[in-house]
Each structure stands twice: as C-alpha cells, then as structure tokens.
Amino acid sequence: MRSEHFVNNRNCSLLTALSPNKKDMTKEELKKYLPHREPMLLVDEINIDENKVVHSKYHVTGEEFFLKGHFPGQPTVPGVILCEIMGQSCALLILDDLKDKITLYTGIDNVRFKQQVVPGDTIEVEATLSNQRANMYFCEAKATVNGKLCAKGSLSFALIEDQRNK
C-alpha cells in the first residue's frame, strides 16, 4: 500500500476503478467487486460522486430471508442487516484496491438505529472513507428511507488477499 493512499473527508486521494464517465453500477456489475451473492448481496445499485462519496440503494421487496421471522405479521429489516448494507456500500469506496482482494469487517462502532425499515422501503446509503492505515480502512455511513435517517455508524475493515480463486 502506498503512503499517498491516506485519506480524510477533506482530501480524498483514493482512486476508484470507475472511469470519469462510469460512476453508476448495476447489481450485476457490482458482482465484479463484491464477493457476496444472493441472498447476501444487499446493494442493488451505486453511484460514486465526484467527491468520492458512495450513494447506494437496496430495495426491500418483502421476500428477503431475514424478514421471514423478524417479525411475523410485522416484517422489519433487522439492524444487523442494515449494518451489512452499509458495510457492503463502504467496501465500494475502494474499488481500485479490490482487485484480487476482499474486505473483512473488523469493527462497527457508534451504530444507532433511528427508525424501522419495512417491505416496500428503499434504503439509501451514503458512505465516506474517513481514514486508511496500511490495509485497514475506516468509514462513516448513514442509511435513510425517504430522506429520514434509519441507521448510522462507523465501520472498519481489513483488505486481504482473495483466496477463493487460488
């Protein structure tokens, strides 16, 4: 890892794998970067803006496995799933570094859940990279539904070699 890969909110110097003309990705394109597959691929689409902020969406259909028993008669997306959605979005902040590597989460701090997420909702995540040291990355993420905050937190992850294809 090169030393110029240090980032903070004011000076994001990490590059992404996206060209200046390709900042939007579909779920199928995301599979090139994330190791997750259905039913655990929890990002439907993303956009990385000019400030290196990830904007992602996940559409809650009501058919998800995690809604089956949480809660009968009143299905609600579990908080841990909201964390996973934010986590997958954070990994997309470092697309350029994901080649032959995967992210393993090392911490989720200061997470707060503010409102329920139910079938029919579209979860929108905004994630930023706040710091990086060696192979460790630190992010801030918030999830909203219809502009209302439903979850927020600080996430950290390590970037490791992808052993699946070796």
Language model features with spans:
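Cationic, low-complexity basic patches in intrinsically disordered or flexible, solvent-exposed regions
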Residues: H5
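Short Pro/Gly-enriched beta-strand edge/turn motifs at strand-loop
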Residues: D24-L30, D121-V125
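Short aromatic-glycine motifs in intrinsically disordered, low-complexity regions
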Residues: K27-R37, K99
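Catalytic strand-loop segment that frames the active site of acyl-thioester-processing enzymes
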Residues: E38-V77
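Active-site helix/loop of acyl-thioester processing domains in fatty-acid/polyketide metabolism
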Residues: I46, V77-D100
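HotDog/MaoC-like acyl-thioester-processing domains
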Residues: N51-H55, V117-D121, T128-K166
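Hydrophobic beta-strand-centered segment that forms part of the acyl-chain substrate-binding groove
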Residues: S89-E124, C150-A158
